[in-house]
Amino acid sequence: MTRPVLAALVLQLALAFPALSGAIAYRLDPEASTVTFETDFGPDLITGSIPLTAADLRLDFENAANCTVAVALDVTGASASFPFAAQALKGPKVLDAEAHPQMTFQSTSVTGEGTLAEITGNLTIRGVTRPVSLLAEVFRPQGSAESDRSRLTVRLSGRVNRSDFGATGWSDMVGDEVRIVITARIGVQE
C-alpha cells in the first residue's frame, strides 16, 4: 500500500498559506472531480472510473492531524475500458453494485513529512471495511495568489487488493492489485 497522502497536502498548504489557521471546510465539485482506476488484464490494462458523489473535506493548513476526509462513490455508475469489463465490474463477483451501491472512505489519521502527506483511513467496498493509506498532493489554480485557498485540486493516489474486499471474480484473468487516482476539485464552503 502506498504511504504519503493528505499529510503532504496539508504541509504543502501550510507552507504556502501561513495566514489561515484552523480546519477549513471544503465542498466538492462532483462534475469536475474524477476517480479512476487500473488493473492488469494479462499483458494489457483494464481502466475505468467510478463517479465521486460526495466528499466532506476539512483541511487544517497548520496541523495535519486536524484534517479529515470522507468520500462516497457511486458504484452503480462505474465504467470500464471495454463493455464486458464494465458489466463484470458491477456484477456480483466483483463490486456487486446491486447489493452495495456505494463505496466509502473515511480518514482516521493524516500525517506529513516535508511536502508529502499520507491519509490513512477505512475503505468500505462490498460491505467490507479495510484500512488503506493514500498519498495526497494539493494544487492551486494557475495564476491564483499563494494565499488563495478558496479553490483547490486534491490528487489522492493509492493501491488496494480487490481480494481484501471479497471482489475475487475472474482472478485467473484480472490482477488483484487495483491502482486508484482520485482528483477532487474543491472550494471553500460558505
Predicted features by range, described:
Residues M1-P4:
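Positively charged n-region of N-terminal signal peptides that target proteins for export
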Residues A7-P18:
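Bacterial N-terminal signal peptides
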Residues L20-E190:
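Low-complexity, acidic/polar, glycine-enriched regions of mature
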